[in-house]
Swiss-Prot record:
Designated name of the protein: Deoxyuridine 5'-triphosphate nucleotidohydrolase
Protein origin, superkingdom: Viruses
GO molecular function, one term: dUTP diphosphatase activity
Family per record: Belongs to the dUTPase family.
Annotated TM spans: none
SUPFAM superfamilies named in the record: dUTPase-like
Known partners and oligomeric status: Homotrimer.
GO CC, alphabetical: host cell cytoplasm; virion component
Induction per the UniProt record: Expressed in the early phase of the viral replicative cycle.
UniProt record, GO biological process: nucleotide metabolic process
Keyword Iron-sulfur found: no
Gene3D superfamilies: 2.70.40.10
InterPro entries noted in UniProt: dUTPase-like (IPR029054), dUTPase-like_sf (IPR036157), dUTPase_trimeric (IPR033704)
Length: 165
């Protein structure tokens, strides 16, 4: 079976950039580009960026985690932007909106335009996705059903993970 991403816009704004469709990864790209859904100004220092989407990934029919990684366009001669945690690791049980912590290392604000891609999604195990499935905004979808992990963001479990006693 295949590796597939499922992207669901959660705002009307995001629907503009993510119309319902199934995209076949003919080029066999490892990363799936993710759009910014609105114009943003990133101030020097730490910024929280909403992506206005939920994302799930499955490999061989089983839900799996994925990584959020910077694209090369994130850091250029004109702008010095990095992900605060280098790589965002998304648990298989997370069903909330994707958000980014981006640090603007420069001294001046940086303009980001809607439909600009700063990050990409990479399946756990670095499996090449076969399909990217864009769902309707209010579509009920089993991979987004409530889980014990839930919608809490940025390490919100407050626990040390599976090694707790």
């Amino acid at each position: 079976m295949a590796t597939n991403f499922f992207i669901q816009p959660i705002t009307e704004e995001a629907e503009t950039y993510y119309p319902p469709s199934v995209i076949t990864n003919k080029r066999q790209d490892l990363g799936v580009d993710v759009y910014c859904c609105s114009d943003l100004v990133l101030q020097p220092g730490l910024n929280i960026v909403r992506l206005h989407i939920k994302v799930a990934c499955e490999h061989r029919g089983k839900k799996c985690g994925f990584k959020i990684m910077a694209r090369s366009s994130m850091c250029t001669h004109e702008r010095l932007l990095i992900l605060a945690n280098s790589i965002g690791l998304i648990d298989p049980g997370y069903v909330g909106e994707l958000m980014l912590k981006i640090i603007n290392l420069g001294d001046t604000p940086v303009q980001i335009w809607a439909k600009e891609c700063l990050v990409q999604l990479v399946a756990q195990g670095d499996h090449v996705p076969d399909h990217i499935n864009i769902l309707k905004r209010n579509q009920i979808f089993p991979l987004f059903a409530p889980t014990p992990r839930g919608e809490g963001r940025f390490g919100s479990t407050g626990e040390a993970g599976i090694m707790r006693t």
